[in-house]
């Protein structure tokens, strides 16, 4: 961290620093969003319905048939003995599956994969992808056999090693593993929601001003089933918004947010584009070297020049505020270095965050005074103040529309 600011700097930074109540507000709002994310996914996956199907199997299964087919399905007879030894005995379908049941009802794969406490990502990596079958895509006999054997061998070991004491332990295993998957998805969702909270209002504002041409995006879908960073196969789409009514645009954005939109680009009527969450390289033609940058937002004008860029940090945990600032300043410094070494104009820079603790607000204010930053935005403060919201939208429009003068300076 830098030296402590002087008295005048102290006065400046307080307008950006989050109060204790603002931090509590941000944490509450983040907790609600996280809870809704988990609950919506559990509902969409129909976990309760799948569990009811498993319990029905447990009431109807033929113990002798299961014993006959156990080894070919990858089930250890010793594991079945362990379930029989419980008082009362535990039904075999609570932990193990037969291939025929998976063919009949592919959604059961979700249950048995989670009982085995293995992730979709790992299943995909070993050539036994289950993702689409878990939302009812038909499953062939051979693949069902391979999946059943793999999962049953894992669960057999878990049963024999632990005894799995407790009549509801199978449900605990399912929900713990689903929770772990959703938690990983939530960590990615925090950043996506930060983009949406900033970009959607700007898109509407640009449209009202008749300065918006189109948006480019992809959607992740309503359900999180796998590691989305590793399986980022969403189709890129472009929608022309120029000429549409305000209600049409608002309805479209609401529908896209429900499908978990990922904004990629905003195209303005003046020819500028704002690129979002991009990795790009700037080249020095003389040295043949290239420099990688990855701004969260960056304005591109038609001459392949970039007059403005920003870092956007979601998340409400005050313990992470310092790290967010550190990550942002590293990104800023990479952009400055890349611009200097490729003989480009240095972009004006902005920092946006859900909260700013005092230390971060002090440093951000110092960067402003030193001319390193063009603006700093505390998104929770902005959300609480209509006047600040309007000022923020107007500033963003100015940054999005920015051009360069004859000297190469941003205007």
What are these regions (language model features)?
Residues 32, 44, 59, 85, ...:
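Generic surface-pattern signal
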Residues 76, 209-212, 345:
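Short coil/loop linkers at secondary-structure junctions
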Residues 122-290:
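The feature marks a conserved, polyanion-engaging helical scaffold used by nucleic-acid processing enzymes
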Residues 1-201:
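Nuclease-adjacent, charged terminal/linker segments that flank catalytic cores
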Residues 216-411:
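Catalytic core segments in nucleotide and nucleic-acid processing enzymes
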